[in-house]
Amino acid sequence: MLIYLFEWLSHYFKGLEVFSNYISVRIIMISITSLLITLALGRPMISWLQKMQIGQIVRDDGPQSHFSKRNTPTMGGVLILSSVIISCLLWGDLTSIYLWILILVVIFFGAIGFFDDYLKLVLKHPKGLRAKYKFALQSIFSIVLAIVLFYLLSKNGQMSLSIPFSKSLYIPMGIVIFVVLAFFIINGSSNAVNLTDGLDGLAIVPVVLVAAGLGIYAYIETNSTLANYLLFNYLGNPGLAEVAVFCAAVCGSGLAFLWFNSHPAEVFMGDVGSLTLGAVLGVIAVMVRQELIFFIMGLLFVVEALSVMLQVGSYKLRNGKRIFRMAPIHHHFELKGWPETKVVIRFWIISLILFLIGLAAIKVR
């Protein structure tokens, strides 16, 4: 919205055209805007959640240190999502269909997560939205979205799977493989981030790092000069560059949310935040054709999800025997005696290393 205002004002005031003509400037401005919105609305929202008694439910069989988290305000993810949408409407190019798709993903998965949280925290339904209904909604949306993305991206022939650390190795994909891969990436990422969000600040930092990494790839691949210089396939789809702007909004809002979510957490994002942010990252990875880079940068999420799958499989197939003391795996380390802050910071370090490996693939090819 603001880019049109600055474009008009630039006819009367020299220099204002940088806010409408340069995506790099808008990336900076949207990250600052989303950060300030989240910081400004954070305290009032926490107070409102406390007043409405929308608080965290803690498992009785979990680490004893978690008992103090009981009734901590939850559903703070609404704050992140609202900030991202408002910032995108202000600084995004509203003619970009890719920007609107990402906003739609935020709204749809946010609605699923919100309803799940509402059932658990407000109506006191012990399990919230049933897993089969949640999975069905996610699946239908992901499949439809994957088909839409296939036809949008295929207009410029960008239907190959990019192989990291390779200059010219790409795997072509037809619609079936593309849709299946996109389905698993979007749904898997959504649920993996949701499983990771179990300790103060644990999930939001990896989310910010992965969003930043994918944003960098989006900026490079939609800039013909940078793409040619770094030997990337140039993604010339009109409006696709707005993916980088969207990523910046996620980073700004996520960092501001960490202000309130760091130990001891004043608010948790809830399913409304974690399910949505995970889905958004998956969609972005598909849009910029960097699914394998996303796997590298988001490997922490993969490990968290695999730990749950292995735990459940072991319990069912080995007569109740478990691999971990508790799953997801961050709880396993807590029950081994690691303080929560040590688990979180070490997982952050791992996520940072994975982020740097993913960035290294830009040049080491």
Swiss-Prot record:
Q: Which cofactor does it need?
A: Mg(2+)
Give TM regions. 22-42, 74-94, 95-115, 133-153, 168-188, 201-221, 240-260, 267-287, 292-312, 342-362
The protein's annotated pathway: Cell wall biogenesis; peptidoglycan biosynthesis
This enzyme catalyses: UDP-N-acetyl-alpha-D-muramoyl-L-alanyl-gamma-D-glutamyl-meso-2,6-diaminopimeloyl-D-alanyl-D-alanine + di-trans,octa-cis-undecaprenyl phosphate = di-trans,octa-cis-undecaprenyl diphospho-N-acetyl-alpha-D-muramoyl-L-alanyl-D-glutamyl-meso-2,6-diaminopimeloyl-D-alanyl-D-alanine + UMP
Q: Which UniProt keywords apply?
A: Cell cycle, Cell division, Cell inner membrane, Cell membrane, Cell shape, Cell wall biogenesis/degradation, Magnesium, Membrane, Metal-binding, Peptidoglycan synthesis, Transferase, Transmembrane, Transmembrane helix
Where does the protein end up?
Answer: Cell inner membrane
Query: Does Methyltransferase show up as a keyword for this record?
Result: no
Q: Which GO terms describe its molecular function?
A: metal ion binding; phospho-N-acetylmuramoyl-pentapeptide-transferase activity; UDP-N-acetylmuramoyl-L-alanyl-D-glutamyl-meso-2,6-diaminopimelyl-D-alanyl-D-alanine:undecaprenyl-phosphate transferase activity
Superkingdom classification of source: Bacteria
- Enzyme Commission number(s) of this protein: 2.7.8.13
Task: Give the UniProt record's GO annotations in the biological process aspect.
Answer: cell division; cell wall organization; peptidoglycan biosynthetic process; regulation of cell shape
Give GO cellular component annotations, separated by semicolons. Answer: plasma membrane
Instruction: Identify its membrane topology class.
Output: Multi-pass membrane protein
Q: Which HAMAP family match?
A: MraY
Q: What does this protein do?
A: Catalyzes the initial step of the lipid cycle reactions in the biosynthesis of the cell wall peptidoglycan: transfers peptidoglycan precursor phospho-MurNAc-pentapeptide from UDP-MurNAc-pentapeptide onto the lipid carrier undecaprenyl phosphate, yielding undecaprenyl-pyrophosphoryl-MurNAc-pentapeptide, known as lipid I.
The family note in this entry says:
Belongs to the glycosyltransferase 4 family. MraY subfamily.
Q: What is this protein called?
A: Phospho-N-acetylmuramoyl-pentapeptide-transferase
Query: What is the scientific name of the source organism?
Result: Francisella tularensis subsp. tularensis (strain WY96-3418)
